[in-house]
């Protein structure tokens, strides 16, 4: 089986030219990291974790060190990861003071009998596992402080159909052994209520992975994604014989018509077919397969280049 990794940097509204370049660099870097892990014989789980860590470490994206702020001006992050081989899953929500929530989600998957830990319980588990704690203010950027003030003035968190509230990072992968996995991570919605949890850590909404079907990671307005169970809905269409592109169009179209939700997704099937689709204005994405790197941000700017 030829390995593949696909990554996304979150659905978004119009993006400035200079920020597009920075996001392009970040998304390509993440795909290259994930694909490098696969080429060296790493697992799909290793690849999606590595790709998402690269995005969490990039302040251009709404995850990890780039996470947006809640109403109290603090960072609360959500993440989940799933192994399609045996449907193992790990998720965390409302976590603070750690650099890479996706690493903690994987520890939940591999080191506990549970699927999901939240808030103080997740923090206690992180400490027990030796995950380094960092001061919360180190995750707060000046850019996101200004963004919060603007959103408070406009009551942005209440604008559920507004593209500026879209943002997540994610990855899906298929490895040499035919195993699939997904990972998704986010800082959530700007000016969200303290303790708000979106789709990202909820398996079936923020992502899903099953070797019998494929893997998916979603992005967009979390409440809308939760309402339609976007990830599992898309894989259901694939189970029913739809192509990955048809399945993506059907599920995104349903979310838009049924609950007026905008978003995007990346999918890889068990046979290695893949797609990146979105109904928001833009979505940074990249895919690496067969020594080629495919990437884009807007619907009409897809490019292909050779991988190093």
UniProtKB/Swiss-Prot annotation:
CDD domains documented for this protein? ASRGL1_like (cd04702)
Q: Where does substrate bind?
A: 196-199, 219-222
Give me the reactions it catalyses.
L-asparagine + H2O = L-aspartate + NH4(+); Cleavage of a beta-linked Asp residue from the N-terminus of a polypeptide
Signal peptide limits? none
Tell me the compartments it is located in: Cytoplasm
Q: How is it modified after translation?
A: Cleaved into an alpha and beta chain by autocatalysis; this activates the enzyme. The N-terminal residue of the beta subunit is responsible for the nucleophile hydrolase activity.
Matching entries from Pfam families are given as: Asparaginase_2
Does the keyword Ligase feature in the UniProt annotation? no
Identify the catalytic residues. 168
Q: What biological processes does GO assign it? A: asparagine catabolic process via L-aspartate; proteolysis
Please list the GO terms describing molecular function: asparaginase activity; beta-aspartyl-peptidase activity
Q: Respond yes or no to whether keyword Hydrolase is given for this record.
A: yes
Gene Ontology CC: cytoplasm; photoreceptor inner segment
Q: Which UniProt keywords apply?
A: Acetylation, Autocatalytic cleavage, Cytoplasm, Hydrolase, Protease
Highest taxon above the source species? Eukaryota
- Spell out the subunit comment: Heterodimer of an alpha and beta chain produced by autocleavage. This heterodimer may then dimerize in turn, giving rise to a heterotetramer.
This one is known as Isoaspartyl peptidase/L-asparaginase
Q: Which organism is it from?
A: Macaca fascicularis (Crab-eating macaque)
């Amino acid at each position: 089986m030829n390995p593949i990794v696909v990554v996304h940097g979150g659905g978004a509204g119009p993006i400035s030219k200079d920020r597009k370049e920075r996001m392009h660099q970040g998304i390509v870097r993440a795909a290259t990291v994930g694909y490098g892990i696969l080429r060296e014989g790493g697992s799909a789980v290793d690849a999606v974790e590595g790709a998402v860590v690269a995005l969490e470490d990039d302040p251009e994206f709404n995850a990890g060190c780039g996470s947006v702020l809640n109403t109290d001006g603090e960072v609360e992050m959500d993440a989940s990861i799933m192994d399609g081989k045996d449907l193992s899953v790990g998720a965390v929500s409302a976590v603070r003071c750690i650099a890479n929530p996706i690493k903690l989600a994987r520890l939940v998957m591999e080191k506990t009998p549970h699927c999901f830990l939240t808030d103080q319980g997740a923090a206690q588990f992180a400490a027990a596992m030796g995950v380094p704690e960092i001061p919360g203010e180190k995750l707060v950027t000046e850019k996101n402080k200004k963004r919060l003030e603007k959103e408070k003035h406009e009551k942005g968190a209440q604008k559920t159909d507004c593209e500026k509230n879209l943002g997540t990072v994610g990855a899906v992968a298929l490895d040499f052994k035919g195993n699939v996995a997904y990972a998704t991570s986010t800082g959530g919605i700007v000016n969200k209520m303290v303790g708000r949890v979106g789709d990202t850590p909820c398996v079936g909404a923020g992502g899903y992975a099953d070797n019998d079907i494929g893997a998916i990671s979603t992005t967009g307005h979390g409440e809308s994604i939760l309402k339609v169970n976007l990830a599992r809905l898309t894989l259901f269409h694939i189970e029913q014989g739809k192509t990955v592109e048809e399945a993506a169009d059907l599920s995104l179209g349903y979310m838009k018509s049924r609950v007026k939700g905008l978003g995007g997704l990346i999918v890889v099937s068990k046979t290695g077919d893949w797609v990146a689709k979105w109904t928001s204005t833009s979505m940074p994405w990249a895919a690496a397969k067969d020594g080629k790197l495919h990437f884009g941000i807007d619907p009409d700017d897809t490019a292909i280049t050779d991988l190093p």
